[in-house]
Regions:
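Helix-coil modules at protein/domain termini and other flexible surface or pore-lining loops
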Residues: 1-207
Length: 207
């Protein structure tokens, strides 16, 4: 995490049924180039799996051995208005899931500590409780218990306040797993994807 994270303008260059800074073909080509240079077996192949009944192309991205070992899954699905959009979608689903699990597996990304020791450096328990709509009436007691738990904390950036904050990674991962993990052609594009997914899942749970 850099000392300061800044959102920049991301100009749309592709607007065919979606707004992106690159075309779907450029997205696929960028991934293939970066994956080849990583020295990891991430993507085995992509396959078109729809039968044309709905007129919506659907692709699967089949995990390479390194991705399969890391994520525990064999494939992801992606859809789009065109076959190349669907293929790019399936690949980016793999990218975000693989990246999340790889991040989780790297001890250098975390510090194990109690919230009671981190104090103002960490996200407050009140915010965590609101994020899951806790209406138990035992917030104070649960907060004291939570503050004493040794957890893995990772550095994040609070976009609203413009500052770093420590997040209890495993607390979020246990509840959400890969909900909200996101990939894009740039930081801003990825964040739009991830934030919208969190809103989508939250509303779904709410109703």
């Amino acid at each position: 995490m850099p000392d300061k994270f800044t959102l920049n303008d991301a100009y749309k260059r592709f607007t065919g049924d979606q707004d992106k800074v690159l075309t779907p073909r450029e997205t696929i080509d960028n991934f293939m180039q970066k994956a080849a240079g990583a020295g990891l077996d991430i993507l085995k192949e992509t396959r078109r799996v729809d039968r044309g009944r709905l007129g919506i192309p659907v692709y699967s991205s089949i995990c390479g051995q390194d991705a399969k070992n890391m994520t525990g899954t064999a494939k992801q699905m992606g859809k789009g208005a065109t076959p190349v959009q669907a293929e790019a979608s399936a690949i980016m689903e793999l990218v975000e899931r693989f990246s999340l699990y790889r991040f989780s597996a790297n001890p250098a990304n975390f510090q194990t500590d109690r919230q009671a020791d981190l104090k103002d450096k960490s996200m407050s328990f009140a915010v965590l409780a609101r994020s899951v709509d806790d209406i138990s009436g035992n917030i104070d007691a649960v907060g004291r218990f939570f503050a004493d738990l040794p957890l893995r904390w990772t550095t994040a950036w609070n976009l609203t306040r413009g500052e770093k904050v420590l997040l209890p990674f495993d607390w979020f991962f246990a509840i959400n797993q890969f909900n909200g993990s996101c990939a894009g052609n740039c930081n801003e594009e990825a964040l739009c994807q991830g934030i919208c997914e969190v809103v989508e899942r939250h509303v779904c749970c709410d109703i």
